[in-house]
């Protein structure tokens, strides 16, 4: 498959993640998780990663058009004609038996077919850029992906890449991020002062591009499929960057959808509602619980204030690693209830420790 081409890029290995809040630290090691599976992934600069994939696919004979915009789609049953606009404004058309929308934040079909609907995740926005990480420490400290929580709903990500650059960005309530004055660069420079731990490391470094702001990052849709099309990855649902759930849904939805499309084009009957939509919603609902409970503070309580129970930590680690369909995991099967319950126990233990102290 594509794995060998990606291995040649020597991306930074992500074997876990670190969460910080003040002087408290919670480390997750993907090799110590409840569900069997991969113990690592990569920390990748997305542009390079995507280009590595498209370059490899072109060697397989896949036609990929760059610098084109989809401006219209007309369906006749499951057949469709897609209108494409070139950089010079000229139009062309593509006929297809089936469309897979993997356009991410571009959300092509949701926009054209009026499929967008409000997400029930809170209104958060992100602001981010890349820097040449010239003050990067040696060893694990310099390479570990870290989430620095500066307040209940606002946190900084630090994602080091193997090419010497690092992605830095904040997520927080939309109105809070909008409250910072000036250009996008000035906004992010001011926000970096919120991180006592990382401020010195990134102070004075030039941003590789004007920081990008994505407003109200959580997205949802009225339906995940229709006659002749399917939505995959972020073009369907996007919750929040905090647990890399977008990567999980992108890979899983694309894999499931591709198998179902192959069946359908071979003349077999496919139950898109149960085999795709309901299946994907199961995973979305699990991750949505963890995102919501992150911002209520319950999950943060488990991370930073609970007695370190290795069984519970392994079960939560499996969720963070993307294994959100494993019903053997109590933190998947009982996700609605269990996070609240364990957080409450942690708070009681904390109060008990205070009274003893």
Feature map (PLM): residue ranges:
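Predominantly flavin-linked oxidoreductase catalytic cores and closely associated redox partners
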Residues: 56-199
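Helix-loop-beta segment of a Rossmann-like dinucleotide-binding subdomain
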Residues: 25-44, 81, 171-175
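A short, glycine/Asx- and small/polar-enriched loop/turn
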Residues: 13-15, 22-23, 74-81, 225-227
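Short beta-strand to alpha-helix junction loop
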Residues: 34-56, 177-183
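N-terminal FAD cofactor-binding segment of flavoenzymes
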Residues: 1-22
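FAD/FMN-dependent oxidoreductases across multiple families
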Residues: 9, 176-260, 264-277
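C-terminal helical "tail/cap" subdomain of flavin- and related membrane-associated enzymes
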Residues: 259-357
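Hydrophobic "anchor" residues on beta-strands that sit immediately upstream
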Residues: 4, 93, 97, 230, ...
């Amino acid at each position: 498959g594509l794995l060998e081409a990606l291995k040649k890029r020597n991306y930074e290995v992500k074997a876990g993640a670190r969460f910080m809040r003040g002087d408290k630290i919670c480390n997750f090691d993907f090799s110590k998780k409840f569900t069997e599976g991969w113990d690592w992934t990569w920390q990748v600069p997305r542009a390079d990663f995507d280009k590595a994939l498209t370059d490899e696919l072109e060697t397989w004979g896949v036609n990929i058009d760059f610098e084109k915009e989809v401006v219209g789609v007309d369906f006749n049953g499951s057949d469709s004609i897609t209108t494409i606009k070139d950089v010079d404004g000229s139009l062309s058309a593509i006929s297809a038996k089936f469309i897979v929308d993997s356009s991410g934040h571009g959300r092509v079909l949701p926009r054209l077919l009026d499929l967008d609907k409000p997400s029930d995740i809170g209104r958060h926005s992100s602001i981010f850029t890349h820097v040449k990480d010239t003050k990067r420490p040696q060893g694990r400290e310099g390479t570990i992906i870290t989430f620095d929580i500066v307040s209940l709903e606002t946190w900084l990500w630090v994602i080091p890449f193997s090419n010497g650059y690092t992605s830095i960005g904040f997520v927080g309530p939309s109105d809070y991020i909008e409250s910072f004055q000036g250009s996008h660069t000035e906004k992010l420079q001011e926000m970096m002062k919120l991180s006592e731990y990382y401020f010195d490391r990134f102070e004075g470094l030039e941003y590789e591009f004007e920081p990008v702001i994505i407003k109200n990052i959580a997205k949802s849709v009225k339906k995940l499929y229709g006659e002749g099309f399917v939505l995959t990855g972020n073009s369907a649902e996007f919750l929040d960057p905090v647990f890399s759930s977008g990567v999980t849904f992108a890979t899983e939805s694309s894999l499931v959808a591709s198998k179902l499309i192959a069946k359908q084009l071979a003349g077999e009957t496919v139950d898109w509602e149960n085999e795709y939509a309901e299946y994907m919603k199961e995973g979305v609902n699990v991750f949505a619980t963890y995102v919501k409970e992150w911002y209520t503070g319950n999950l943060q309580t488990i991370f930073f204030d609970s007695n370190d129970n290795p069984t519970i930590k392994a079960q939560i680690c499996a969720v963070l690693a993307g294994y959100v369909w494993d019903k053997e995991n109590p933190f998947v099967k009982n996700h609605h209830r269990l996070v609240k319950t364990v957080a409450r126990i942690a708070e009681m233990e904390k109060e008990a420790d205070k009274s003893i102290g």
